[in-house]
Amino acid sequence: SFGNAVVSRFINTDIKEIRIFSRDEMKQDDMRKLYNNDKLKFYIGDVRDQNSVDDVMRDVDYMFHAAALKQVPSCEFHPMQAVKTNIVGTENVLNSAINAGVKKVIVLSTDKAVYPINAMGISKAMMERVVVAKGRNVAETMIAVTRYGNVIASRGSVIPLFINQLRSGAPITITNPKMTRFMMSLDQAVELVLFAFENGKSGDIFVQKAPAVTIELLVNTIKNIIGRPKHEVKTIGTRHGEKLYETLLTKEEMVKAIDMGEYFRIPADTRDLNYNKFFEEGEEVLNEAGEYHSHNTHRLN
């Protein structure tokens, strides 16, 4: 979903070449037919395979890294696969980008990386730490993170699932009607990445100020739009690794977050391991702030 949105944004600009790197040849073939544009170049490979990543990175100026295992339940059953793709794969991508002299890299993360309770979130939290650590030690390549909530109607999200259940006549299955989730459109997801691209410094994390919705209200809205307000809804209970609400910024991050209008920027902690000087010098930080989560943000009606 994100890849298509970015390609749509850039395909008619003066960008010389756009490279699509993924392991899914079917989706690449679909994109090739959809855009039918010589500016697009397709590369089959996997972020787990350093050689294939190295091959695609030659002569690249800018890179957006969205490859990930992102299904929470499946990562609970296969946590090492999440480690290999989300953590090791990201390090492979960053190493290739740095060695190839790429100017800017934006890495896509998730709100599930904040206070993680599941394998997917833990792997994404570690991915963010890898980005910050790399960014701390590299001057030539700017590496930053964007942290998302739910992207409306993106592949693998709940809205297409609910619509398919409605149209097939099956009950709509929800886990907890009071569960809240951040919501943003695909266009907003692209805008967040471009904002980070234009304004980021190495190790930065960027977050959009996003509204949230309860699952109950989301389902009722979809039922009304489709024209089936009385369609059955079945509560099946919380799935593996699910939270009642998601958090985009921790209390600690909110203390140092820089308000940039529609976005927050969390600069990297650039201190080194020589802690003695921090006990002997500097000012005591007394600021306190609350975390930014889907229960306390603006609610959609």
Question: What name fits each language-model region?
Answer:
Residues 93, 99, 128-129, 133-301:
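Strand-loop microenvironment adjacent to phosphate/nucleotide-handling motifs in alpha/beta enzyme folds
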Residues 24, 111, 211:
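Residues in the short beta-alpha loop(s) of Rossmann-like NAD(P)-binding domains
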Residues 22, 43-44, 84, 176, ...:
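Conserved residues in the N-terminal Rossmann fold of short-chain dehydrogenase/reductase
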Residues 65, 69-129, 133, 143:
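Conserved Rossmann-fold NAD(P)-dependent oxidoreductase catalytic core, especially the SDR/UDP-sugar
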Residues 36, 41-62:
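Conserved Rossmann-fold cofactor-binding substructure of NAD(P)-dependent oxidoreductases
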Residues 6-11:
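Aromatic pocket-lining residues of Rossmann-like dinucleotide-binding sites
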Residues 14-27:
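Conserved glycine-rich Rossmann-like NAD(P)H-binding loop of the short-chain dehydrogenase/reductase
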